[in-house]
Design a protein with these regions (language model features):
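Gly-Asp-aromatic-enriched flexible segments
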Residues: 1-134
Length: 134
């Protein structure tokens, strides 16, 4: 319905301590259109500069990407969907995830002066996701 006002949903500091987290309070209906925005940074643990961008991390490995799961879009990297609108074909909850090989030391702690590899997190806050649903 073109007249339907968008519903805006925010997830501040999505869970990055496991592969996938379901957010049952954010439900989609068949036919929804979802505009996806996301940003910020995550503590990936380890040694040295360990904060990485949530959407498009600068890293020597193929890890540390934020993931999204919408009905019909399972474990997709946010990097390829931010700034786009997707069509939801079936009902279901939001699932957000994270790519890593050691989830136990991830989070949003010990930022201090750690702006990440190559200062990629300079001026950025903690990770977030915003969805506009119509």
């Amino acid at each position: 319905d073109a007249a339907r006002a968008p519903m805006h949903c925010f997830v501040i500091e999505p869970n990055v301590r496991q592969k996938a987290t379901t957010y049952p309070q954010i439900q989609f209906e068949a036919g929804n259109r979802v505009f996806i925005e996301a940003g910020g940074c995550v503590q990936t643990g380890g040694h040295g500069k360990t904060w990485k961008r949530y959407v498009d991390p600068a890293s020597d490995s193929d890890l540390y990407h934020g993931l999204i799961g919408l009905p019909g879009y399972v474990d997709r990297r946010l990097q390829g969907l931010v700034g786009t609108q997707v069509f939801v074909a079936e009902a279901g909850p939001l699932v957000l995830g994270y790519e890593d090989n050691n989830f136990g030391d991830n989070g949003y702690y010990a930022r201090n002066s750690d702006n990440g590899t190559g200062n990629q997190c300079l001026g950025l806050g903690n990770a977030w996701v915003r969805l506009s649903i119509t």
